[in-house]
Amino acid sequence: MKFETSTRRAVVFMLASILAGSLAVRAYAADKDKKDKTKPAPNKTIDSGAFGIFIKGQRVATETFHIEQQEGATVIKSQLKEASGGDSSQKSDMEISATSELLRYEWSQSSGGSLSVFPENEFLKEKISAPGAAKPTEQAFLMPAASPVLDNNFFVHREVLAWKYLAIAPCKDENGQRRCEPADFGVLVPQDRSSMPVRMTLVGKEKVTIRGAERELLRLNLHGDGFDWALWLDDHDQFKLIKIAIPADNTEVVRD
């Protein structure tokens, strides 16, 4: 798939932003700190909004999310609520370092139960607190801290993975353009207490109908054991995730 070099640069810049900036930016900030040590760097919103989750055309839930670049890290917060208006909800809170390594991940639900994931001795460990349990249980994963987290139902995690793929996918220059190959990732699914391999592939530009209006978006495919998803990003608006299609489940996720 051809991927224009200018587009590639934009994606790399986007990933640099979400990972708290390049070394040059940090060096500049350090020099500036010498002049004004008491002034902290302002937080920067990378993306925020909501995704509507539809099954067979009917809205069943809404995910609201916020991605913020803070000093030395990026925080990704999300909340999932049922469309029926009930009190049931889930929350996730993830923090990654400037080198794309997981610092912490936390999940909880209103009905009780929570979990956390954190690095320990160069690998990842998960701590699970089940409703009514006397004490939490722990599970170790022989995965590096740079492993992406793709937890159930939080689609903003797929947006972050798409940004990472577009920035690091194996590519080669051809006549001023880049042809990108698929990339494989080992990801962690905390709610399932499991890990799995996934592959992301750049398909290219497609015309997609979003709420009755036709838009040209950048399509990527996400494939894993037993699932195939299509993702569409707006390469004219910071590569924001606009839509996900999960045909096997009659499910669509659309940005509000």
Model-predicted segments: where are they?
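Bacterial N-terminal signal peptides
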Residues: F13-S22
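Acidic/charged, solvent-exposed loop-and-adjacent secondary-structure segments enriched in E/D, K/R, S/T
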Residues: I128-F154
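Sec/Tat signal peptide C-region and signal peptidase I cleavage site
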Residues: A24-Y28
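Beta-strand/loop-rich accessory regions of lumenal/periplasmic or secreted enzymes
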Residues: P144-C180
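Acidic, serine/threonine-rich low-complexity disordered tracts
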Residues: A30-G132, A167-D256
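Short, Lys/Arg-rich N-terminal segment immediately upstream of the first membrane anchor
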Residues: K2-S6
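N-terminal export leaders
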Residues: T7-V12
